[in-house]
Amino acid sequence: MGDAGSVAPVRRQRARQIARFAAIGTGATVAATAATGGVLLGQARQARRTIPMAQAPPPRCDGVYGAKLPGPPVTMVILGDSSAAGYGVHRRRETPGSLLATGLSRRLHRPVRLHRFAVVGSLSSGLKPQVESALEVEPDVAVILVGGNDVTNRTPFPVAVRYLVDAVRTLRAAGCEVVVGTCPDLGTIRPIQPPLRWLARRWSRQLAAAQTVAVVEAGGRTVSLGDMLGPRFAAEPGRMFAWDRFHPSAEGYAIAAAALLPTVLSALGAVPERRPVLPGVEGVRSLPEAAHQAARHAGTEVSGAQLRGRDRGPGGRWAQLRRRAFFGVGAVPPTGSAADSATLEGTA
């Protein structure tokens, strides 16, 4: 299992990432002037000075949730980077894994066994060892949150997507359902100032769209988080971001979990509630068009579909767009809830 608590060099790592990201902006537009490049590099240096030192690793959240409920437990694994590990919060019940396991247990009325293999600072290339560890526990469903570090580390998008696809295919081949929360909107991070912030937003959305197409092709489902969380995080940064102004706060993670939970339920065969239909948003269309629509309409689920008995049409694979109702998991559970009473199994 990867050690999600290895965060001592987080500030230095984040500083290098921001500097590299500034280099992306400097080289991404050939016509950019040297002065523009200097502005970007200056903004990167300012962001490095603003982001504080790491204080503690994210709390462990492994265990059985709803242990007293009837039936065999559903096994869920959480893979990805610091956003999957829950970096930025201090209580187990505030982590995305705990929020999802609690909500899943309540909706299914069954125990949920949670294993977190996410690693702080992980790139998409780090998913392979996480998947290998996850397969040992025979998961029913995997939730993957990854992509932000690929943007800041200048990972070529085709390379990052290939690693993600390999992870999804391996899990699906083992009979595990897969839900991917696509790349977050890095343009909401306050220590990053315009024009570097604009580049961050553009690259985040490009990677999220590429992830959507590739994951659905590989048999998984996606939920667009960037375009949903971006406006809320930009409007209320004091509430949505943690103390480091880079990672989500407890409330930020709760909103993300509320968006992911309906799709996790659907992947497991449950039928979650749906929000009112938006004309022109829901329905079956080509996968590239579906990815574009999902980016424009927050919280939209994208999954594979058939049309007239065919998986593919002139525009490629068919995809289904759905809008799910956000469940009450968005509220951080109070002390004494199922999240706090989870049976821990050998966790630190």
Model-derived features with residue positions:
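Conserved catalytic region of serine esterases and O-acyltransferases that act on ester linkages
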Residues: 2-35, 39-43, 255-348
